[in-house]
Amino acid sequence: MAAAEMERTMSFDAAEKLKAADGGGGEVDDELEEGEIVEESNDTASYLGKEITVKHPLEHSWTFWFDNSTTKSRQTAWGSSLRNLYTFSTVEDFWGAYNNIHHPSKLIMGADFHCFKHKIEPQWEDPVCANGGTWKMSFSKGKSDTSWLYTLLAMIGHQFDHGDEICGAVVSVRAKGEKIALWTKNAANETAQVSIGKQWKQFLDYSDSVGFIFHDDAKRLDRSAKNRYTV
C-alpha cells in the first residue's frame, strides 16, 4: 500500500457506513407529494449518534516517549532521561495526540521521539527488544516529518506482514540531519527482518538503501557496528 493510501486508510468512509446503516439503499422508490418531507429513519439517526462517540480500536496500544541525548552525560544511568508522554489505543486518540505534539522538524537538537507498543520501553535492555535490532533511514535536516507520520501509520495500522516483530520506532534529530529507526524484536529472523525493511521502504517511497544492525553489535561495537541485512 502506498504512503498516501495509508493515510486515507486511517480516515473513515462515512458515506459507505451510512449506506450500510440505511439497509444498503440510496434510492427512493415512491415519488414525494409536493410539500412532503422525508423523515430520517430511526436506524440512520441511531447510527449518526453513535458515530460521534464510537472510537475505532487499534490492534495494539502504543506509547509516545521523549528523550534528549544531550542530557545523558548528566544522568546517573542511560535511559533515565526517557519520559513517558501518552498512551493511545484508538485511531481517534492517535490523531488527537499527533496533532498536538511537535513534529521532527520542530524538535530541539539532540531530541529522540519514540512510539513503541505499550509496555515496551525504547531501550536495548527491555526484554522484548534485547535480541532485536533496527532498520535506519537518514534524512536532510527538517525533511523527515512526512516519513515519520507514514512510519507511524504503517506501524499502528498493522500494515507490515510481520507486524508482530515490530517493537516501535524513533526519530532522532541531530546537527547533520534526522534519522528514523524501526526497532524489531528478533534480529536473527532474517526472513521477517528483510520483509519489514522492504515494506518500510515501499510505504515511504524511500529509494536509498537501508541497513539493519543487531542491538548486540551496537552495544559491543558502537558506531563500528556493521549492517547484517541491507535492502
Curated annotation (Swiss-Prot):
Chief localisation class: nucleus
Cystine pairs: C129-C167
Outcome of substituting M109I: In strain: PI 247087, allele pot-1
Subcellular localization: Nucleus; Cytoplasm
UniProt modification remark: According to the redox status, the Cys-129-Cys-167 disulfide bridge may have a role in regulating protein function by affecting its ability to bind capped mRNA.
Pfam families assigned to the protein according to its UniProt record, in alphabetical order: IF4E (PF01652)
InterPro entries listed in its UniProt record: TIF_eIF4e-like, TIF_eIF_4E
Record-level GO BP terms: defense response to virus; regulation of translation; translational initiation
SUPFAM superfamilies in the record: eIF4e-like
GO molecular function, one term: translation initiation factor activity
Chain sites annotated for binding mRNA: 74-79, 106, 124-125, 174-179, 219-223
Keywords: Cytoplasm, Disulfide bond, Host-virus interaction, Initiation factor, Nucleus, Plant defense, Protein biosynthesis, RNA-binding, Translation regulation
Superkingdom, taxonomy of origin: Eukaryota
Consequence the record notes for mutating A77D: In strain: PI 247087, allele pot-1
Listed GO CC annotations: cytoplasm; eukaryotic translation initiation factor 4F complex; nucleus
Region called EIF4G-binding, residue ranges: 56-59, 66-102, 150-159
Other information: Displayed sequence is cv. PI 134417 and confers susceptibility to potyviruses (e.g. potato virus Y (PVY) and tobacco etch virus (TEV)).
Role of this protein: Component of the protein complex eIF4F, which is involved in the recognition of the mRNA cap, ATP-dependent unwinding of 5'-terminal secondary structure and recruitment of mRNA to the ribosome. Recognizes and binds the 7-methylguanosine-containing mRNA cap during an early step in the initiation of protein synthesis and facilitates ribosome binding by inducing the unwinding of the mRNAs secondary structures. Key component of recessive resistance to potyviruses.
Subunit: EIF4F is a multi-subunit complex, the composition of which varies with external and internal environmental conditions. It is composed of at least EIF4A, EIF4E and EIF4G. EIF4E is also known to interact with other partners. In higher plants two isoforms of EIF4F have been identified, named isoform EIF4F and isoform EIF(iso)4F. Isoform EIF4F has subunits p220 and p26, whereas isoform EIF(iso)4F has subunits p82 and p28. (Microbial infection) Interacts with potyvirus viral genome-linked protein (VPg); this interaction is possible in susceptible hosts but impaired in resistant plants.
Family the UniProt entry places it in: Belongs to the eukaryotic initiation factor 4E family.
Protein name: Eukaryotic translation initiation factor 4E-1
